[in-house]
Curated annotation (Swiss-Prot):
Species classification: Eukaryota, Fungi, Dikarya, Ascomycota, Saccharomycotina
UniProt-listed InterPro entries: AA_adenyl_dom, ACP-like_sf, AMP-bd_C_sf, AMP-binding_CS, AMP-dep_synth/lig_dom, ANL_N_sf, Far_NAD-bd, Lys2
Record protein name field: L-2-aminoadipate reductase
Catalytic activity: (S)-2-amino-6-oxohexanoate + NADP(+) + H2O = L-2-aminoadipate + NADPH + 2 H(+); (S)-2-amino-6-oxohexanoate + NAD(+) + H2O = L-2-aminoadipate + NADH + 2 H(+); (S)-2-amino-6-oxohexanoate + AMP + diphosphate + NADP(+) = L-2-aminoadipate + ATP + NADPH + H(+)
Enzyme's top EC category: oxidoreductase
Tree of life domain: Eukaryota
PANTHER family to which the protein is assigned, alphabetical: CARRIER DOMAIN-CONTAINING PROTEIN, L-2-AMINOADIPATE REDUCTASE
Species, as recorded: Saccharomyces cerevisiae (strain ATCC 204508 / S288c)
Amino acid sequence: MTNEKVWIEKLDNPTLSVLPHDFLRPQQEPYTKQATYSLQLPQLDVPHDSFSNKYAVALSVWAALIYRVTGDDDIVLYIANNKILRFNIQPTWSFNELYSTINNELNKLNSIEANFSFDELAEKIQSCQDLERTPQLFRLAFLENQDFKLDEFKHHLVDFALNLDTSNNAHVLNLIYNSLLYSNERVTIVADQFTQYLTAALSDPSNCITKISLITASSKDSLPDPTKNLGWCDFVGCIHDIFQDNAEAFPERTCVVETPTLNSDKSRSFTYRDINRTSNIVAHYLIKTGIKRGDVVMIYSSRGVDLMVCVMGVLKAGATFSVIDPAYPPARQTIYLGVAKPRGLIVIRAAGQLDQLVEDYINDELEIVSRINSIAIQENGTIEGGKLDNGEDVLAPYDHYKDTRTGVVVGPDSNPTLSFTSGSEGIPKGVLGRHFSLAYYFNWMSKRFNLTENDKFTMLSGIAHDPIQRDMFTPLFLGAQLYVPTQDDIGTPGRLAEWMSKYGCTVTHLTPAMGQLLTAQATTPFPKLHHAFFVGDILTKRDCLRLQTLAENCRIVNMYGTTETQRAVSYFEVKSKNDDPNFLKKLKDVMPAGKGMLNVQLLVVNRNDRTQICGIGEIGEIYVRAGGLAEGYRGLPELNKEKFVNNWFVEKDHWNYLDKDNGEPWRQFWLGPRDRLYRTGDLGRYLPNGDCECCGRADDQVKIRGFRIELGEIDTHISQHPLVRENITLVRKNADNEPTLITFMVPRFDKPDDLSKFQSDVPKEVETDPIVKGLIGYHLLSKDIRTFLKKRLASYAMPSLIVVMDKLPLNPNGKVDKPKLQFPTPKQLNLVAENTVSETDDSQFTNVEREVRDLWLSILPTKPASVSPDDSFFDLGGHSILATKMIFTLKKKLQVDLPLGTIFKYPTIKAFAAEIDRIKSSGGSSQGEVVENVTANYAEDAKKLVETLPSSYPSREYFVEPNSAEGKTTINVFVTGVTGFLGSYILADLLGRSPKNYSFKVFAHVRAKDEEAAFARLQKAGITYGTWNEKFASNIKVVLGDLSKSQFGLSDEKWMDLANTVDIIIHNGALVHWVYPYAKLRDPNVISTINVMSLAAVGKPKFFDFVSSTSTLDTEYYFNLSDKLVSEGKPGILESDDLMNSASGLTGGYGQSKWAAEYIIRRAGERGLRGCIVRPGYVTGASANGSSNTDDFLLRFLKGSVQLGKIPDIENSVNMVPVDHVARVVVATSLNPPKENELAVAQVTGHPRILFKDYLYTLHDYGYDVEIESYSKWKKSLEASVIDRNEENALYPLLHMVLDNLPESTKAPELDDRNAVASLKKDTAWTGVDWSNGIGVTPEEVGIYIAFLNKVGFLPPPTHNDKLPLPSIELTQAQISLVASGAGARGSSAAA
């Protein structure tokens, strides 16, 4: 390979790390303004025995800092001698390991010449990969004794470079930076961090690179102190008491003004006395009719004064108010009621009547003791609540209480509010607020933002959204006025700005979405607005500019917080346009979160060491610390423990000395000082001035067909397109029920000239459908955005569809109404296809290519405006499930029979058509040739790979009998695949054992970004599969790494530590895929096995257990041999068979990969390795409760049979064994290998086995409508259902298997299992139970599986009640929720 090719391969798709900068990147010349800051590094002037290469030491520090401030583990740097360093950094490395890695990389680079410029290389890559733009290969640099310019390269503009100058017998570090991006203050902090990090690393090189503090002396005072007293005992009183005091002090002052509707020219104005009196009446009614302190009262509300009256009435009664918006569908309203479980209900007259569905739910499910059916305040200040049967108003008897306080005492920890935030599976979480927070911050805010009793506030927040509390309580605290617009004022573009101007509003609370509504198509200025407080979502510069164009005196305050932090938020203030016209120009696109308000801290915590606060620029997770946090989630104690945590920086009772009992009447409702943090799940970093900026979600990821995708990242890139105004990317199910990325966006209508270039005519007949209209009218814009994104996103992160809309729908809370944004229906997509002018040049295609193109377009979810012969099926929106449909449609329409793997081998139109041409011209079938070729490859490949094995392996001896020795010895077991189905049970089996003189510690391999994330994955898998026990945690050590890499990518030191610790290796991890060819499975299933096995070649001797699969036997030879042996009275295929008779003939890539791995392991056994190959068949649900991996062939067959109503008459026996027994065999053979002097095989077979037909017909026994059909008839029924009628069926992804001679493919040879029996017999000494007789799957066991599938929603309930009742099983709610959400739909179990 030439040097040029080496560099091209090395620099494929590099990560261009961006050091956090202070100013926007210039979009036009000049792009750079070079500046330099220099500092002495005396630490490097003295010799260090361990670090001979001083340049590598300093480079290591720079790499560590880059990782800490960007989170990028792919480090790419331009370095000395015209080279580019690229390596993966690990957060668990010590500085020694980092230095060693970099030093080794530098030595390797010395042998690779770069006798060309990297500009030339980038142009070569552009040409080779046919890129539209020359790729940038690096953005950061670290040099030595080099005079460097940031714009030295044509295609690689450098942001920040460090140059180590050793020319004067001293070490001077020059920081060369673009001052158009970075402030002097930022650069000084980076220099201080570098110096501090270098000192710490050299003083103790064993320090973990992610745990060396980045808080410097110069920046410490800018950052929050997590041990500071935040006024835990400073309760200022309850908001309703403060309001009553105000009402008595100035009763005639205007409190609420409802502005007139279209049919009226008169406002409705109410005084503080009016609101106080009417709310007193409501409060006394609630109390007298049974509402107790702490009861929840639900308010069915409209926007207006009535809501204020109801809220105050509920609070005065000592109760908790919650609000339902009538805009929500009735079914959704019942969900909120189910979470809240109210004891009281108030219906505001203006909100209308409750839907009958809601009334039925209230009557059937709730225990309502107090109800007001039609509350409305009259213009004269009196209150009505609805008529009784005698004609009297329900509230009339309580009118005499209008000037009487209730006397109900509540305290700082009483719960005045129940607000809702999103939850899993569409079930909202109810957040209980605290009285401490409601009024605590208003006094500070009035001083900080100059808010007074003369201000006019607005009621613009969603009425069921917690910011509505700010709208109401802020003016009530101050004695100010609240103005209420009509729905027409809010909903008519441009009208809300006119309303703000007409009524002279001075202060408003907005969400960014409501702010966009305020400014959309608005021309009327509202200069009296002096403050706009934004909450609820990210606030962009564009949002601020639009608002200040109309409100030039408005200071904009971005407030960061959540429903869970209640009023405890941070703030960042944008100066008004009049105060500083250029203020926004200096800021980046997204407004920072700023600093905490009075006694509120945003703690950005080191993700690898939570005892550390992050330094300036370092990415961490944001925790909010304050005395004003909400109480927690209603009825979710486990989630409360996870999200509301005690401050670990101080002792739990540290602040108790501050709590002075002065006989306050509320003291019984006070839990004392509680220093708590709310874990937001947001990532953030500190700016040089101590402000905080958000960097996305720690969990803002989705998984599409195995790829982890950040939705926030996609939206950020799309928002940078010059014609995009608003955008949101979501995951939606398409017509095939496949999760699909789809972007909804609003274009820049204020740029009509630019936009017109991308507009197309829309036929009148489809103009009324906004989705169809957008897809047709702006398909050129969508194409341009996709082109724009190709340069910025990986192909799998590209939205499958971009829908252009006139506006994004908002929910009543002023946020984007995501449920209304759904994947277009097939009818809509067909209309788009019929009415879009194709830009495809037919002359580019041959006849067969044209047929292939048209066939693909007929089954793809979206129809691209242009297609070329070089377009890939997958680039056009295809995936493995659609590939199944495509292959069957091909067979039906073109009479060409191709195996499914063909599309993976020939993915473009041109290549796929050429393969069809070849098959037709040869008159043969592709399948035979492909199989023959691949068959030869896997066996030959395995033989070649054996040559890479060590010449010998140390042989381990058996463990001492578990009950024969004194003392306790720890057995250390390294296990792969622990987050999969079988792996989860292996882990549980190991850690559930308690032999007398042994304990177990599991070294669990998990792929994740860090140990915390890895453990979370492992724990989630355990909960999902029903195996997790909290006691396991202390006996688990997570091992990070990539099994496909030598030494898993670990340093030599860590590798040897592991090798010298581990006693047993259980290699269970594998990629299970029924379509992928051997080539795609070679790395995860074969190479990884060699790498795991290499752990047994060094250090202490180990047993090696490998989980294989009976798919290694799936050849005609073994089917015939099995029949022969059984006819002779023998049990079946011997465990001693060397499998050389399936060295050819295996047709599936998965079985081939397992065969190759087994072959290599047996050869290692000949060289001394001891242990066992465990060969299970179908690994099925847990025997006790059916816990299963729902993405399973046999379970899909159950569901598909229910959906079709038919089952095939197939008499084959099925080798099914419950997962807990398979795990038992794996662990038993790992502790007690069957053979002492050789590496043997243990086959897992069911005792008894069940016939395939009987397995499926169990559905009938438990009340499902299924009938038996011959396989040929059943096949036609399924094909007609799925292919012809497009009906949903769980077997859809497996059509290639179930419609292709299923009676043959479900054959399972009978197996000898004497080795498994021997190990289980020996295992009796370890477990106290003899399992050597084995277990299988009976009809009764299938009943348990059906019960499980019912409980998690995978199967519908049985249709007949006169059959067997489903068995009773026990599952935790957490497991049900996870499985129902799809968490159990994939597993890494090696067994098929």
